[in-house]
Structures are given as C-alpha cells and as structure tokens.
Amino acid sequence: MRHVWVIGAATLLFATTAPAFEGTIKLRTTALTADQLAEGNGGKKLDDAAILAMTPEQLAKNDKAQVRESMVYVSGSKVRMDMPMESKGSGYAVVDLDKGLTWFVVPGEKRYIEWSETDAKAIGEKMAQMKKMMTERMASMPPDQRKQVEAMMKNMQMPDDEAAPQPTVAITPLNKTQTINGMSATGYKATEDENTVVAWVTNDQPELNKALLNVSERMEKLTPANMRKENVRRQLQQKGLPVMVQNLGGGRYRVEEIIAVEQKPVEATLFVVPQDYAKTTGRDALKNIPGPGGPPASAPAAAAPAKKP
C-alpha cells in the first residue's frame, strides 16, 4: 500500500508546479508473490528474467493478483489523490503547495490529519528529546537492556545528527523503447535495497517532466537533511516521467503504472475538506508522548479552531 502512495504522491505533487497542466492522472498497481506466480505456472518457479517479462495484463489474469487503481486530480497549486484504504474504505489526500499544507482525509471516520513543515519540525524536536531522555536513563539500566537500547538508538536518525553516507545507485540504460499506455517510454534498470527495478520513463508529458525536479526540492524541505535518501525513483525523475516501474525482490513482484493522463477542467470542490470533519495535526500526536520532564499533561490547553482548507 505504501508504494501506491509513493508513486501517486510523486505524480500528483510534481504536476501541481506546472500551471499549464490541469486534469487527471489514473494510476494502477498490480502485485503477486513469487509463490503465487509459481502456482500460476503449474508449480514451477520462474526466474527473474521471466517474471520481469510479464506485463500487468498477464499478472492480472492470476486470480490472486492484487490490483489497485487510484485517481489524481490536479488544478493549479492544488492536488488530490484518491485511493483505497485496506481497513477503512476509501480515503484521499489533498495537497496545497501555496499554503504548504497536506490533508489526509478519512471519510469513513469523518476526520482528517493536517501536515505542515511546522509539524515536521515539531516531530523532529520531540525525537531529539526522546533520544536525550533514553541516553540519560541508560546508565541505570541492566547490561542486557542497555545493549538493546544502544542498538535501537544507533539506528535512530535525529534532525541534528550528521548525515550518513549514501550508497551510489547505478541506473543502466536498457537501450530499449516501447509504448506503454499510449506513451513512448525508454527503459532503465537498477538495483535498490536488493530489489531489481526496471523502469520505463516517458517525455511525452513535458509539463509534468519540467515540474518534477521542482517538487523534489519542495519535498526535501519537509525532511531533515541527514534523513534524506538518494533512491532510484529520484534519479529516474531526472530522466523524465516514470510511466511504469517494475519492482522485484523480497519474494514479491509489483508493477506501478500511470495508465492515463487527461488534461481537462477539474471541479474545485474535489480539493475541499468537509467542514464537519474532525481535525488533528502531526503535533497533536505528540501530546501523548512523554518528554524528558515526565508524562504528558492530562488536560492540555485547548487550541483555537483552525480554518478549514
């Protein structure tokens, strides 16, 4: 599910920085495990080359294939992405780049979460406080428990930590082109986190391609410098719009596609969160996390109601 949001968020965000583009983007993700692929092949295990040669249409013929579709709506600086939620029905995200705000909306529960740079900063500060508190308490811990906490803290990155060296991700041209969902695309191959990635990149959408790097820079501002990670998708964005990304690893094969891009007027109401929905923010989640001074207050001061997006 996370990967659907990743490709969707990347597409919807970079689209908004191009004022000339207004319309919709349709996404689809198709996934199967290696065992399910073998079952569909008469019990015979397929090698990586055979799996990567399978198209989404071929995968979808397997009755165990997980197929999910979602829509992205773009209008000026506002973007909305609809998508299914495994346990709560459908949900959507609204991004307003002019305001620097994102709203994650859950209609089934009539609530939404607001996220901003202020929330990201507050969470980073809280993480630093927690790390300091754990460091102070380690001195009184039994040796075994102290080792466990030390190991956990070693993997925790804080806003004031130095950035860890980033491994170089090599992207190799396949020297192949094909038409995918009506768009001419060039193939590339890479390895990331022990996964094989084959991506097909198009330049048929110039407005979207031009906006890609601008949005990447905006998104980086929401992440502390030491926590930013160079990845295959970021490098692919330098080459154009990834119209299809095949990912094989961990016993799973997943294909993410942009199956349609349509330029047309979009209703303004799609970007409005209902007034009667309950609001929470990223900072609200911090109220129940104890700080260095002890447990959180039992009755925090009420905040003034914020304006709806």
Residue map of PLM features:
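Positively charged n-region of N-terminal signal peptides that target proteins for export
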Residues: 1-4
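Extended soluble regions of mature proteins
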Residues: 19-309
